[in-house]
Regions:
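Amphipathic alpha-helical repeat elements characteristic of tetratricopeptide repeat
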Residues: 3-4, 60-64, 175
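Protein C-terminal end segments and domain termini
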Residues: 300-401
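A short, glycine-centered helix-capping/turn motif at helix boundaries
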Residues: 16-18, 76, 158, 188
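Double-stranded DNA-binding cores of transcription factors and transposases
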Residues: 1-36
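Basic, flexible linker segments flanking DNA-binding modules
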Residues: 18, 40-135, 143, 226-228
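RNase H-like DDE/DDD metal-dependent nuclease/strand-transfer catalytic core used by mobile genetic elements
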Residues: 91-110, 122-300, 365, 370-401
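Conserved short loop/turn motifs at secondary-structure junctions
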Residues: 29-31, 69-70, 84-92, 168, ...
Length: 401
């Protein structure tokens, strides 16, 4: 998008009040067959070029955008996270009270449900982080584990900014290092302290964190701490949000397939199909949640993205100093004498040895199903499209054998 989009055109679209979704449609029409014009790409482009709405948003315009937001992210976003979501769509500077009123008008039943469950639970154990770059919390979420979906997230303890998430079939040392820790180190730098639970899936990440520990901002701190998962406070807060906004709606739809005997989780090909579709669907929800979370206002402090820019003390590290996955695995196994399990799928992909058939399956799935539509419907209580996609994936795989 950076090479093809005209910045003046994008600014003009925003000035006319077009959302990122609308701009994505326009650019896709201008450059048919060219990838890279998704709504998320447009969001990133606008953020990098400081392009956002500067004209007042009328109540009617706000109402329409909130209704679209509810359709996209479901019933659990309150005024703060919905304000964050609207910011990801280019709508800045809208008061929480206005967003709250629009939410109440857009979906009264959702508003009542949020109010009924809004009692806040106090955390009896004080939490402290000195700056962005002090504590990095990494944890896994397996609420969809029975369907071959595991989320891993990394959050900065000071700002609350989600700096990286990854979705994988099964938790795995190599995938967590490759898709979570290494991208964080390359993008932001090193944290003084990495905090994880006692799971063995973090061994490679801890090994590299320790090997790079001399390059941290504050080398007097322990480079990592392992504790009970329930005491990994910032990341545990995030999982509650993710479960409500992503995992539970997807799980509810898939549970129906199992209950109706339409999905056999003892059969390896079916396990692979449900994992493939559920992972891609949940990635849509995770992307929407992460963007909204990082733009939601924290009273008296600003958004996580803003706090990051004000107190960033993560230690920059040159890319060549961060080992590749292959280098990290070799170093770990040489130093410990252990062996790390390579990445693997949930269930059996019978087309794995045929790239042409794998590509054909992917193209057929994209042609027949839109992942954003699947997620939006599932999160609003209609899981039929997700169920159809799982069954279609299984039958399509069988037909390509």
């Amino acid at each position: 998008m950076e090479e093809l989009a005209d910045e003046d055109d994008v600014r003009a679209y925003i000035a006319q009040g077009f959302t990122h979704d609308k701009i994505s449609d326009l650019l896709t029409g201008q450059f048919p067959g060219v990838r890279g014009f998704s709504a998320r790409s447009v969001r990133r482009y606008c953020k990098e070029h400081d392009i956002h709405w500067t004209t007042p948003v009328t109540d009617d315009e706000l109402q329409r955008e909130v209704e679209k937001g509810v359709e996209a992210v479901g019933p659990t976003y309150g005024r703060k996270t919905m304000k964050g979501y609207l910011a990801t769509q280019g709508l800045y500077g809208i008061g929480e009270a206005r967003v709250g009123r629009a939410l109440k008008e857009a979906a009264p039943e959702y508003h009542q449900s949020r109010q009924a469950s809004a009692a806040r639970r106090a955390n009896p154990i004080p939490y402290y982080a000195e700056y962005f770059g002090h504590k990095l919390h990494i944890d896994q979420n397996e609420k969809l584990g029975m369907y071959g979906v595991t989320h891993v997230a990394a959050i900065d303890g000071y700002s609350g900014k989600l700096v990286q998430t990854a979705t994988m079939p099964l938790k795995n040392n190599q995938v967590i290092y490759r898709d979570v820790f290494r991208p964080v180190a390359l993008t932001y730098g090193l944290w003084d302290q990495l905090r994880v639970d006692h799971g063995s899936e973090f061994l490679l990440t801890l090994f590299v964190q320790e090997s790079l520990s001399a390059q941290r901002t504050n080398t007097s701190r322990e480079c990592y701490v392992q504790s009970d998962s329930r005491r990994n406070h910032p990341i545990e807060r995030i999982w509650g949000e993710v479960n409500q906004r992503v995992n539970y709606p997807i799980k509810a739809a898939l549970n129906i397939l199992v209950e109706q005997d339409a999905l056999d989780l003892t059969e390896e090909k079916s396990k692979f199909s449900v994992s493939s579709v559920a992972m891609e669907t949940s990635k849509v929800g995770m992307a929407r949640f992460v963007d909204s979370w990082n733009m939601h206002p924290i009273p008296g402090r600003g958004t996580p993205d803003f706090i990051w820019t004000q107190q960033n003390r993560a230690a920059p590290i040159p890319p060549y100093a961060v080992p590749s996955l292959h280098e990290a695995v070799l170093a770990y196994e040489a130093a410990t004498g252990g062996t790390l399990v390579p990445p693997h799928t949930f269930g059996l992909d019978v087309l794995a040895h045929s790239p042409a058939k794998t590509l054909e399956r992917e193209q057929q799935m994209r042609h027949n199903f839109n992942l954003e539509d699947i997620f939006s419907r599932a999160v609003n209580g209609d899981g039929t499209l997700l169920q159809q996609a799982v069954i279609y994936h299984r039958r399509l795989t069988e037909s390509l054998l």
